[in-house]
């Protein structure tokens, strides 16, 4: 399929990665972006277009820079470990400029429909209808990469909150929240304790008279900052920790995580402890919530049973009067209306092989990129998905039979149903390392730790015990990057660089302790490599 045209729908993080992957494989990408700029979710707008992903002005990303970068383009070392949304967008602009991606994007262009050509069973081609400034055009493409994300359509379940129609105060979805000023001096209820709900409750509590955070189940709250000040995802995302989880089981892993989170504050005492285990729900990442709760600025409440004109009555019988505003941080739903019947979404559930390919197509020339909710960054997963999809489009990689794909999809869905609480939020979950390793295997770029243990033991040890960063998948195989080894071995330097803005007496106690721990674990490396890899 070399030299063939591929339509890329959306110019957010996934779309940019797809354009670059197409170029690397000799394909001709044409990216359609409905707005006038790149960035998708991460481009803040005070008044976003309908159907476009939207964030609030203060958003800080929940994954650290080393874990979220594109695999052959590290984020500058002076950038903070957890970046403001404007810095995330700046990084995307740098990436697009570095690899010359902008010239392949048609801005202000909406994709109206993507239909199979009459000869699709033999050609695998698609007819893509677009509209730009009132003018419609149709073009034929040999492949389609859908990168529209899953934070576009606000999920607002008003039917679950009787009386909301007579509530005299203001109510809105978190998508429409931008800053806290308009809630100054007011009594506000935030419904939902995901990442957005927690962030909004904290931010509004600095100006509001009182904030109530309503939750049906409670939540486990994870801090961005882990032991010794390292980013929490850096500490938790190693192949060794994944290995320990596999051999000890989820029960032990749950107990470990819950103990760590309860060491920071007692979730039961703060009214947050859920009935489910830590790994049965996407944890809420929030650094400030316990501080706002202990100061009384945020009060945790149960689920709202009903609203009156001015009050909220909760399921435990308690009541809060004189409520001025209600913010529904109740998540999002996703759909692909332009695909018609090619990809069906029912209750936020979709059947995709490896969360990428529809299993029912005669030709594998359509892929959904970035439709996953990992405990970790989406960007590197999207990039690996794009690398795999372009190889499939070219015929260099093949998919199993339809029946085999459907069997695996069913098995994955059953596994997810057993692990996670039933929620619209938990239909596209995926473990970060497991997903990355699985797709890397399919692409042929998963590092061979056993081989490296003999040829480059220092690197092998870092790959096993250090954070599983996206750069690991540029060490070998197709798309190998010469700077990968050095970037992997200097990850700690880039973590420390933005923090060390004041000269102090050097203290190597933490580093020495971490190094000693690595050497202690190194003696078990060969045995683990033989068993696990």
Curated annotation (Swiss-Prot):
Modified residues (Phosphothreonine): 284
Modified positions (Dimethylated arginine) in chain numbering: 5
Binding site for FAD: 10-14, 33, 41-42, 62-63
Keyword Phosphoprotein found: yes
Gene Ontology cellular-component terms listed: endoplasmic reticulum membrane
SUPFAM superfamilies, alphabetized: FAD/NAD(P)-binding domain
UniProt protein name: Flavin-containing monooxygenase 5
Organism expressing this protein natively: Oryctolagus cuniculus
Lineage of origin: Eukaryota, Metazoa, Chordata, Craniata, Vertebrata
Encoding gene, per UniProt annotation: FMO5
């Amino acid at each position: 399929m070399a030299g063939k045209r591929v339509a890329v729908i959306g110019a957010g993080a996934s779309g940019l990665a797809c354009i670059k992957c197409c170029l690397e494989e000799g394909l001709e990408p044409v990216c359609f972006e409905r707005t006038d700029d790149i960035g998708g979710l991460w481009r803040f707008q005070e008044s976003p277009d309908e159907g476009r992903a939207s964030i609030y002005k203060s958003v800080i990303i929940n994954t650290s820079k080393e874990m979220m970068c594109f695999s052959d383009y590290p984020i500058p070392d002076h950038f903070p470990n957890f970046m403001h949304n404007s810095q995330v967008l700046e990084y995307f602009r740098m990436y697009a400029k570095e690899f010359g991606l902008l010239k392949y994007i048609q801005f202000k262009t909406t994709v109206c429909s993507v239909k199979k050509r009459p000869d699709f069973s033999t050609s695998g081609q698609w007819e893509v209808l677009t509209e730009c400034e009132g003018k419609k055009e149709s073009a034929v493409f040999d492949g389609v990469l859908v990168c529209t994300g899953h934070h576009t359509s606000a999920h607002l379940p008003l039917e679950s909150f009787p009386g909301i129609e007579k509530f005299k105060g203001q109510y809105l979805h978190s998508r429409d929240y931008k800053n806290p000023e308009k809630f100054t001096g007011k009594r506000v209820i935030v419904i939902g304790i995901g990442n957005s709900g927690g962030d909004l409750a904290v931010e509004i509590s600095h100006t509001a008279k009182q904030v109530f955070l309503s939750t049906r189940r409670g939540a486990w709250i994870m801090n961005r900052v882990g032991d010794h000040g390292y980013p929490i995802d850096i500490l938790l995302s190693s192949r060794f920790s994944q290995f320990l989880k596999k051999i000890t089981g989820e029960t032990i892993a749950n107990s470990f995580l819950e103990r760590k989170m309860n060491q920071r504050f007692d979730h039961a005492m703060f009214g947050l402890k859920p009935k489910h285990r830590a790994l049965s729900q996407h944890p809420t990442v929030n650094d400030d919530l316990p501080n706002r709760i202990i100061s009384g600025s945020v009060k945790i409440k149960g689920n709202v049973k009903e609203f009156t004109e001015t009050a909220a009555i909760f399921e435990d019988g308690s009541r809060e009067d004189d409520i001025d505003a209600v913010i529904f941080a109740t998540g999002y739903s996703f759909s692909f209306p332009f695909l018609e019947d090619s990809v069906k979404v029912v209750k936020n559930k979709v059947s995709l092989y490896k969360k990428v390919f529809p299993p029912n197509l005669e030709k594998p020339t359509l892929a959904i990129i970035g439709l996953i909710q990992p405990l970790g960054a989406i960007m590197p997963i999207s990039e690996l998905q794009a690398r795999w999809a372009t190889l499939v489009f070219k015929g260099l990689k093949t998919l199993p039979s339809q029946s085999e794909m459907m069997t695996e999809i069913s098995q994955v869905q059953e596994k997810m149903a057993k692990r996670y609480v039933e929620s619209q939020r938990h239909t596209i979950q995926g473990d970060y390392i497991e997903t990355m390793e699985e797709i890397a295997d399919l692409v042929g770029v998963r590092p061979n730790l056993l081989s490296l243990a003999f040829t480059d033991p220092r690197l092998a040890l870092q790959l096993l015990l250090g954070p599983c960063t996206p750069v690991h998948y540029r060490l070998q195989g197709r798309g190998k990057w010469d700077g990968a080894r050095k970037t992997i071995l200097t990850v700690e330097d880039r973590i420390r660089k933005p923090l060390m803005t004041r000269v102090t007496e050097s203290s190597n106690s933490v580093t020495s302790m971490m190094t000693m721990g690595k050497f202690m674990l190194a003696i078990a490396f060969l045995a683990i490599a033989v068993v696990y890899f």
